[in-house]
Amino acid sequence: VFIAPNVCITTAEHAIDAEQRNAGLEVAKPIKIGNNVWIGAGTVILGGAEIGDNSVIGAGSVVKKDIPPNVIAVGVPCRPIRQITEEDKKRYPQYPKDNI
């Protein structure tokens, strides 16, 4: 997993009711981040979300629902915009294998 700067991963959720909040009641929901995920800078991931393997989350996104594997997802709320293709893998500079 590659996590860029200023990413917030939080499992805590609070009640809307002020009396419950003042009592300190909160719920923690698990977060699952798959293998080979890239999370862009400033992204917020909220409790209960699952990000599938090999997905890319765009900078500044708010992930509150599940993101499937092998997609590019962005936005507030974060949504998949498309599958990652073989062409995507060729588009950016390839580093020599002996440097990896």
Which residues are covered by each model-predicted region?
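Structural motif
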Residues: 32-35, 50-54, 67-70
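Acidic/histidine-enriched, glycine/proline-rich intrinsically disordered or flexible terminal extensions
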Residues: 89-100
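Beta-rich strand-turn-strand
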Residues: 41-56, 61-65
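A generic membrane alpha-helix/interface feature
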Residues: 18, 66, 93-95
